[in-house]
């Protein structure tokens, strides 16, 4: 089992949007605990806990291991709640609950029931994504985005389970 994965999350920095890599791996057999490193604000940390708990409630496989997530660039404080979708996807990939999709980015807040909620500053986040090397972006269905069809591959999600019906390529 490959246990090292990455995903990019679009977030707001001090003066602009950033595309921050989140790295994840299985630590050992365990019970679904997640160790987190990389300068997260309280709200960003709580968002990661929410993503973990959604998986704990819906995946028997997830609870068999303990994990480590590292948010790259530790000197950059990670604020806000739009990390939720990226954390959920990364933890799903690591645990094997979802087949790994390489070279993607995600932004979206989650609620306790797995709904993907709209995020602020979507235009800025799309600009940051356009500068990245990511080929596919997952965003909330309810975010209004400029017409980017044909330029980028974007998949909109209303619920985390929507990823299962997403067509790639």
Placement of each model-derived feature along the sequence:
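Peripheral, non-AAA+ core regions of ATP-driven protein-machinery
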Residues: 1-169
């Amino acid at each position: 089992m490959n246990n090292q994965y990455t995903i990019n999350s679009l977030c707001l920095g001090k003066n602009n949007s950033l595309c921050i890599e989140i790295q994840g791996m299985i630590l050992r057999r365990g019970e679904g605990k997640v160790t987190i490193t990389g300068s997260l604000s309280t709200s960003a940390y709580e968002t990661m806990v929410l993503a973990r708990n959604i998986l704990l409630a819906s995946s028997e496989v997830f609870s068999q291991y303990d994990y480590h997530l590292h948010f790259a660039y530790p000197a950059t404080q990670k604020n806000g709640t739009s990390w939720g979708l990226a954390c959920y996807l990364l933890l799903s990939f690591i645990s094997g609950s979802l087949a790994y999709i390489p070279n993607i980015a995600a932004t979206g807040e989650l609620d306790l029931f797995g709904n993907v909620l709209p995020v602020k500053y979507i235009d800025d986040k799309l600009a940051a994504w356009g500068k990245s090397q990511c080929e596919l972006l997952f965003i909330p269905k309810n975010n209004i985005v400029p017409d980017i069809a044909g330029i980028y591959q974007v998949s909109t999600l209303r619920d985390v389970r929507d990823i299962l019906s997403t067509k790639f390529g």
